[in-house]
Amino acid sequence: MDTQKIEAAVKMIIEAVGEDANREGLQETPARVARMYQEIFSGLGQTAEEHLSKSFEIIDDNMVVEKDIFFHTMCEHHFLPFYGRAHIAYIPDGRVAGLSKLARTVEVYSKKPQIQERLNIEVADALMDYLGAKGAFVVIEAEHMCMSMRGVRKPGTATLTTVARGLFETDKDLRDQAYRLMGL
């Protein structure tokens, strides 16, 4: 990540909106923003493979559900935050991930400029590709600051998106069971 370029760009934005970039409260802002971007975009170029490839053998194929995984990310359209909760269900195929690994999977894909629909897809596909799940079902509910702070200005509006892979694609009863276990 080119932090010098980010700092220069932030200074230009400060000046472009009519502020004094040398004012006491703004002098360190370009460097702060560059450090923040390093942190919140730390998922760029990463996948969840390192997290999901460490799994444990299991003899049954009962559904695993982890819900209310809090995340925050940046909308790629306006570079404003959106945040919420991810709910994950999957059917193991002889291997299960450690529970923290599901949260880490959400984190990896949320640490980059993102849209909610793609976040759903990337999490579900990671469970299928790296864990070898028989099925994956991901529900994300989020509030988008680009709707709350600007434009339509409707704070508190939740957007829900879902994606189903494998067994969840064709088995409505399985999806319904996942919804119930997720409390949705």
Curated annotation (Swiss-Prot):
Catalysed transformations (reactions): GTP + H2O = 7,8-dihydroneopterin 3'-triphosphate + formate + H(+)
Pathway terms, separated by semicolons: Cofactor biosynthesis; 7,8-dihydroneopterin triphosphate biosynthesis; 7,8-dihydroneopterin triphosphate from GTP: step 1/1
Oligomer and partners: Toroid-shaped homodecamer, composed of two pentamers of five dimers.
Alphabetized UniProt keyword annotations: GTP-binding, Hydrolase, Metal-binding, Nucleotide-binding, One-carbon metabolism, Zinc
Residue positions binding Zn(2+): 75, 78, 146
NCBIfam families membership: folE (TIGR00063), PRK09347.1-2 (NF006825), PRK09347.1-3 (NF006826)
Stored InterPro entries: GTP-CH-I_C/QueF (IPR043133), GTP-CH-I_N (IPR043134), GTP_CycHdrlase_I (IPR001474), GTP_CycHdrlase_I_CS (IPR018234), GTP_CycHdrlase_I_dom (IPR020602)
UniProt GO molecular function: GTP binding; GTP cyclohydrolase I activity; zinc ion binding
EC number: 3.5.4.16
Family, per entry: Belongs to the GTP cyclohydrolase I family.
Domain of life from the UniProt record: Bacteria
Any Gene Ontology CC annotation: cytoplasm
Protein name: GTP cyclohydrolase 1
Organism: Streptococcus pneumoniae serotype 4 (strain ATCC BAA-334 / TIGR4)
Stored HAMAP family: FolE
GO annotation terms (biological process): one-carbon metabolic process; tetrahydrobiopterin biosynthetic process; tetrahydrofolate biosynthetic process
